[in-house]
């Protein structure tokens, strides 16, 4: 008898869906997850903004109420009141999902790679897409560093040292993971995938510049090219999940929060109605993200100052809400904060006028 559900790909979205199914004692049939290397998830880090009533569901391991952006001497520092910045390790996500799968008699993780459509009542495809389908690429290299003494970094550096490049925007992401651990991650939003070796060298230079007199060691590295929108559709062998299914934010790459909620809703719908409602991003989010991607392609030199002004003019909670949900009200708040001339010219497609 064919499985009730077959999930192809066991990354964040595939395992999140499986874990959501595991919350039900009895399922209509078997649930299979095909993933040749589930341990890959353990090398990743997921960050997101959340409200206190979301803590139990999103399960942050590290939290911070302060975040900042900078370009040269210009700095915008936020302190959230309603929203907090949270981080969860891929290791914790993986271990939690594997425990849930192991404890459920009807769910099984199979170490296999599937490239053709399997037989099942419901099939989900969460495989990564080919990089040549990306509209814009977010390239990053991260190093997690363990210090012998407290590193003294109190705020999350969302986008520090922002500079325009020939192909987009480069910045460093600095994430405190407790008092003695720090994730340093040089990132590019780029029309041409960045060279990992260059980003890695910039990470090392950042550590020398800022912590040259401290003792530390690198305990983990991570790197990836992730999509910021798609210029062409990939061929799916099931209902698309994760980045493939539009669950990651085109303009930022944030996806953990959306994926967790979307996969939980999919599991509930299947259990109650045995149907899947297609995932759709809010229209306001699609519009805002496309505007930002067009600026990356046409006027990357204008982006650092635009982002600094937005961060300076928006309240911290409005900024966080826009980054996570982007409702029509969130978009209106963004437009009020953004510099009028660059956004108006971008809306008209007159990028040379910016």
Task: Give residue spans per PLM region.
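Conserved Rossmann-like nucleotide-cofactor binding loop
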Residues: 13, 39, 129
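N-terminal FAD cofactor-binding segment of flavoenzymes
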Residues: 20-24, 29-73, 141
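Predominantly flavin-linked oxidoreductase catalytic cores and closely associated redox partners
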Residues: 100, 104-216, 229, 233-234
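FAD/FMN-dependent oxidoreductases across multiple families
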Residues: 190-269
């Amino acid at each position: 008898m064919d499985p009730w559900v077959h999930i192809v790909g066991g990354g964040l979205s595939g395992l999140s869906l499986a874990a959501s199914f595991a919350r039900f004692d009895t399922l209509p049939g078997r649930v299979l997850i095909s993933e040749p290397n589930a341990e890959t998830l353990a090398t990743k880090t997921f960050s997101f903004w959340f409200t206190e009533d979301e803590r139990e569901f999103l399960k942050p391991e590290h939290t911070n109420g302060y975040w900042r952006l900078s370009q040269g001497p210009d700095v915008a520092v936020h302190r959230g009141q309603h929203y907090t910045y949270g981080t969860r390790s891929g290791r914790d996500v993986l271990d939690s999902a594997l425990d849930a799968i192991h404890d459920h008699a009807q769910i099984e993780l199979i170490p296999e790679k599937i490239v053709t459509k399997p037989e099942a009542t419901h099939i989900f495809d969460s495989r990564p897409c080919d990089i040549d389908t990306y509209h814009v690429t977010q390239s990053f290299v991260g190093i997690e560093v363990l210090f012998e003494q407290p590193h003294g970094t109190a705020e999350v550096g969302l986008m520090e040292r922002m500079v325009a490049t020939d192909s987009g925007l480069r910045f460093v992401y600095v994430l405190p993971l407790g008092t003695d651990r720090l994730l340093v991650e040089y990132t590019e939003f780029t029309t041409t995938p960045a060279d990992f070796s260059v980003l890695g060298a910039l990470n090392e230079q950042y550590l020398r510049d800022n912590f040259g007199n401290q003792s530390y060691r690198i305990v983990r590295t991570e790197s990836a090219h992730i999509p910021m929108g798609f210029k062409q559709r990939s061929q799916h062998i099931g209902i698309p999940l994760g980045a493939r299914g539009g669950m990651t934010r085109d303009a930022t790459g944030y996806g953990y929060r959306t994926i967790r909620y979307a996969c939980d809703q999919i599991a509930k719908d299947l259990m109650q109605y045995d149907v899947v409602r297609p995932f759709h991003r809010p229209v306001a989010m699609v519009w805002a993200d496309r505007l930002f991607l067009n600026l990356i392609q046409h006027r990357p030199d204008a982006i650092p100052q635009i982002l600094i002004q937005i961060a300076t003019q928006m309240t911290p909670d409005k900024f966080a809400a826009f980054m996570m949900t982007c409702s029509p009200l969130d978009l209106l708040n963004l437009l009020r904060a953004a510099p009028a001339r660059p956004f108006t010219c971008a809306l008209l497609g007159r990028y040379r006028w910016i």
